């Protein structure tokens, strides 16, 4: 890693020399000497990096160099910080403070020179080759698309495993467990993902769950992870007992499919404890595990272990070729020949093939490919894992600036889902990113990440709400760890986590020069001068540590770049925090007691990211527009006085997302234009909201018109706007790239913009609109296709809305999949050919409900909270032969269900809850449900008995009845009047 950081250091030294800062402190001669020494050392680093694998002395030498480089960087940091302070205070060279500073730094420089002389002299003993290291030109940003690579050679294995899982019949109480065994990098997880996503698995099981286990087989952690996977949301901290109960409720009667990926646990008792909780599932539930250890297969498996073999030479070549030649129509025959020789060395291991393919896609000279083929790394001693030489080769052929960025990823635990933007901010904090012309560091970091992804170092990419998350294969993580530890010493960049006071004292004693510290739990007591001891700290993570007051000594951390205070109870920040002139990121996410920031916040001259989401700020700090480096500002509260107005945003080159609140304080359109939103090309998400009191309705239309965003915008929210119409810029040209729109509380807008013309719009949510709106699109005859990309449509609170479009015409809503209609009592559904999920909330008249039959492709239907309907029309379920899931809840006056239920031949789950007046289930209606596997009836107090036809539903595997007092006795096992109707069902659960 040292060679890449040296380039950053040399850039800084050049800046100091050219900027004559060395003259200010009298260190120009020393700076030039340092630059010369590092340049000489840098010339041999490429050779040293390769030879350290064989020679421990060279590895130790690189560690010493790494330490020295960071110490010099600290000195430069101090000089830059002091220079800024002197400029602000208008101090001269002969001021006592200047003299004192120069004396202290001069002493450190002298010691540093002696260290570097020794390091430079020691390098002569190794006879290292000098090489010219060219800085890589800026990489192209255009055309990069995240795609899932094609999998080769595992179709047969996928088919075999799917058949085992589907055809397996277990007559014991134990849930069958199928282990997949194979060495690291062989593709066990990839194969498990193929099985998990197989259509046959989706159709066979009621519930699919995926959990990554890794080294930590902790029952509480795993149960929590399983529950979170089922519910699709994070849980707070819970004790084991309530977690076990919650999981059993979720699995009860379900034919679930659970994947436990990357299992290392060899403790039989731990598995027995978890298995006991998982028994509750319905007959046919199955568990699939992946592991490298055969012993684990015998401990956990109940089915015969599935041994995964190596890929064939042909499939391995296809995998390599996919990455190395990347859609090229013409390829060099010689490169093809060398490539096949390299593939032979991969030994049929997919991870090796795709990683080397990712490496060679950036190399087109025959000599470069031959260098990889003939590298000595193939001949180094290895353990049983044959993939390591390929991974090491890939690392050593990375460009300089990518090596340390990749190795730094070792600070994250294995199997961590890492946020891309967070990682880039940490790279910046440690000065890993080399500036390139006029490119912003964030863009440089994005290019580095993209290239590492293309080289197959990152996987399992997931994009949510505009943010990218990813993981690293555990063998790739092992590689990062080995490369990172080779460059680190006690002067480590590693993330040290503090769990208690004892940890704190140990770190204070042994790691005073740590660069990264995180508090994983609250530290009950600390000295106000706590942070003074960590003079080199660059990253400080205090998130969710229950700090109520931040020690003012944090202001002494002059090298601090990244400060995470998210999730704490702090009410205010110390003024001394504003002395941190190198601070780049201040994360205050979810600090729910924080109402204001220090008035001197604008002095944080290096601040690039200010995260304020879910902070109840009543105002912004004054003159935030002075933070010209600021790129991320998630939240802005408009003020009425100068220094607090929208004009503060004018010169900020913001990116990402911003929420602007209290726009009612903007007096006119001229003031709104000062925000200069139309020039912010890197802003992808914009939320604008007004507060209801003190509204100036006549001005609000002009204000919103003046807040026109840049055409690059992707997400737009307008909340509680009081004007009588939405702006003209909400048309095709300005919002041509928008994928999601939310309009809420705009009760005076009598008509809606032509959303149907937006070519990229995928999600549209309209809430609490005007009583005058009758149609989402109220234009004349439609000749062009409308809403070409819309997949989700949520509409609520439009009491006179009659439908989607007044006029019919060309094909409309061609890809719409999900609809939610709430509190729109007059709404009638048109004929739509692609809708699969529908939720209806609130009142709806008979015509509206019967028009559901126009949605013939529905697979899921939920009807909630209709307090007036007493029956559902027979026409309602006509044409819904594709329906798989039906839920009817909180229809408090519903007395009966239609017999047309019988037409739902593919229905698998019927869920009826809180229908207090329901007296019976239709005899004829239930008999026709030939595919039904699950029936839930809850809190239907008037339900007197179960229909006779229930006993003919041979596919029914799970029945759950709760809160139906008249059924409890009738369904009593063996003696109840209705027991014969349900005795054939494998899983029956009846609760009071």
UniProtKB/Swiss-Prot annotation:
Question: Gene3D superfamilies in the record, alphabetically?
Answer: 1.20.5.4130, Helical domain of apoptotic protease-activating factors (1.10.8.430), P-loop containing nucleotide triphosphate hydrolases (3.40.50.300), Ribonuclease Inhibitor (3.80.10.10), Winged helix-like DNA-binding domain superfamily/Winged helix DNA-binding domain (1.10.10.10)
Between which residues do disulfide bridges form?
A: none
- Entry binding sites for ATP: 182-189
Q: Which GO terms describe its molecular function?
A: ADP binding; ATP binding
Outcome of mutating residue 775 to F: In susceptible haplotype
Changing residue 154 to K has the effect of: In susceptible haplotype
| SMART domains with a match to the protein in the record | LRR_TYP
Carries keyword Iron? no
User: What keywords does the record list, in alphabetical order?
Assistant: ATP-binding, Leucine-rich repeat, Nucleotide-binding, Plant defense, Repeat
What does the annotation give as the result of altering residue 879 to S? Answer: In susceptible haplotype
CDD domains for this protein: RX-CC_like
Q: Which InterPro entries match?
A: Apaf_helical, Leu-rich_rpt, Leu-rich_rpt_typical-subtyp, LRR_dom_sf, LRR_R13L1-DRL21, NB-ARC, P-loop_NTPase, RX-like_CC
Instruction: Tell me the Gene Ontology biological-process terms attached to this UniProt entry.
Output: defense response to other organism
Q: Which residues cross the membrane?
A: none
The record's section on PANTHER family has: NB-ARC DOMAIN DISEASE RESISTANCE PROTEIN (PTHR36766:SF42), PLANT BROAD-SPECTRUM MILDEW RESISTANCE PROTEIN RPW8 (PTHR36766)
Q: What else is known?
A: Belongs to a four-gene family located at the same locus. Although the four genes are expressed in the resistant haplotype, only RGA2 confers the resistance to P.infestans. In the susceptible haplotype, RGA1 and RGA3 are likely to be pseudogenes created by deletions and mutations, while RGA2 also contains several modifications.
**What is the annotated role of this protein in its UniProt record?**
Disease resistance protein. Resistance proteins guard the plant against pathogens that contain an appropriate avirulence protein via a direct or indirect interaction with this avirulence protein. That triggers a defense system which restricts the pathogen growth.
Report the family membership.
Answer: Belongs to the disease resistance NB-LRR family.
Which protein, by its recorded name, is this? Putative disease resistance protein RGA3
Q: Which organism is it from?
A: Solanum bulbocastanum (Wild potato)
